[in-house]
Amino acid sequence: FLIKNITRSILISYQHGGLYGQEKHFIPEKSERMISDHFISWGWKEKKAFPLPMKISKLPLKKNNNNKYCLFVTWSQTYAYFSYGNNPELTPELSMNPTLGLLRYVSKKIPTILRPQPIPGRDDHVWRDKEFYGKIKKIKIDNHEKNFEFMAAHAKFVIINHFNTTALETLSMNIPTLVFCDKNLINFNSKASKFLLKLIKAK
């Protein structure tokens, strides 16, 4: 249908992450925006963009509490993310091994709940993280019965191994957040860099 009616159709795509637009060379995002007639966004401005308001959490800003666990959120890139189709071993080497070391250290200091980040239709992220990080016997793996906001709001602090929408969400909820990732794996564009500098300087 789309092929037959492509000249008479309007294609609308939408932003599916708060940090969508931060990277200088992220081909999937650039492709979506290039082929779309309109782009629904809640942060980035351009000719094609329909601006939407930011999501507002219904949970109150986090106050000091006596919660005793660390919520450790993982997102491990697939080999396709690195564009090395013949080198899937780069995923644990570049992304997962450093996280494993930190997770092992933190779990010795405080009860730790591992929450692999589920992506609809991409279960490879969840099972791989469970298998890889499950080597650490001290951690508890979250079963996702509670949503992320609930788990984060009831944690003493949150650690995230990728700078993504999840990190922005915990920061907006006033939750102590550590972003643990190799900054060399993300090449930020000039617009995003300005906002990141503001975030770094914020107190």
Set out the residue ranges of the language-model regions.
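Short, aromatic/basic amphipathic alpha-helical patches
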Residues: 2-4, 29, 123-135, 189-196
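Catalytic binding pocket for nucleotide-activated donors in carbohydrate/polymer assembly enzymes
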Residues: 35, 43-51, 65, 74, ...
